C-alpha cells in the first residue's frame, strides 16, 4: 500500500497522474485529501486517516509519499506511524512561505515545537528525499542542507516543483519500499 498526500494545490490534475504512476509500484495507492489551510486540524485528520488505513492494511511494507506541503506531512506522519516515507520537493518551512496563503501559518512552528525532539535523527534512513534542481517554488538546496544528514537525497534535473513526472524514480522508490 502507498498512501499519497497532495501538496498545497489539492485540485491539481497532477495528483491523479502521480497516483497512476505510483500504481506501477503497488496497485493499492490511496490518496488522502486534507484542507491545506488549517495545519493543526490537518495533522489530526492525517494521523487519524493514516492510522485507519494501517489498521486495515495487509501490506507488510506500506509507504507514504507526498509532494511539496504533502512532503512536509508525509515525513512527519510517516515517522509518527512508523512507516517509510518518500518526499518530493518537501516544503520544510511552511511557517515561512505559507504567509498570505493560509490563515495561521504560525501553527506550523507550533507543531514543530510539539513534535518529538530530533525526530529526523530517530527517523534516519526511513525517508527518501527526491529534490528537483528546477524547483521554482522552494529552495531545494536549502532542503538538501537540512535533510542530507539523515536521508538519501536523489536529485532530479528536469522536474519543477509539482513533480509532474515521477516515473524516472519509480524503480528507486520500489527498492526503498521493499526495504520496509
Curated annotation (Swiss-Prot):
Belongs to the UPF0227 family. This is UPF0227 protein Ent638_1623. It comes from Enterobacter sp. (strain 638). Signal peptide: none annotated. HAMAP family: UPF0227. InterPro entries: AB_hydrolase_fold, UPF0227, UPF0227/Esterase_YqiA. PANTHER family: ESTERASE YQIA-RELATED, UPF0227 PROTEIN YCFP. It holds the Pfam family UPF0227.
Amino acid at each position: 500500500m502507498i498512501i499519497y498526500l497532495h501538496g498545497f494545490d489539492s485540485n491539481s490534475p497532477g495528483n491523479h497522474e502521480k497516483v497512476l504512476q505510483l500504481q506501477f509500484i503497488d496497485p493499492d495507492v490511496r490518496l488522502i485529501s486534507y484542507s491545506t489551510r488549517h495545519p493543526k486540524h490537518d495533522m489530526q485528520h492525517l494521523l487519524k486517516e493514516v492510522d485507519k488505513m494501517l489498521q486495515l492494511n495487509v501490506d507488510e511494507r506500506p509507504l507514504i509519499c507526498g509532494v511539496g506541503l504533502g512532503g512536509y506531512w508525509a515525513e512527519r506522519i510517516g515517522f509518527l506511524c512508523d512507516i517509510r516515507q518518500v518526499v518530493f520537493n518537501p516544503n520544510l518551512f511552511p511557517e515561512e512561505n505559507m504567509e498570505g496563503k493560509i490563515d495561521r501559518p504560525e501553527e506550523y512552528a507550533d507543531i514543530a515545537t510539539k513534535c518529538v525532539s530530533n525526530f529526523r535523527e530517530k527517523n534516519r534512513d526511513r525517508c527518501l528525499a527526491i529534490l528537483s534542481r528546477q524547483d521554482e517554488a522552494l529552495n531545494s538546496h536549502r532542503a538538501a542542507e537540512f535533510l542530507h544528514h539523515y536521508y538519501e537525497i536523489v536529485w532530479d534535473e528536469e522536474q519543477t516543483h509539482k513533480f509532474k513526472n515521477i516515473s524516472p524514480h519509480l524503480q528507486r522508490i520500489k527498492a526503498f519500499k521493499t526495504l520496509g
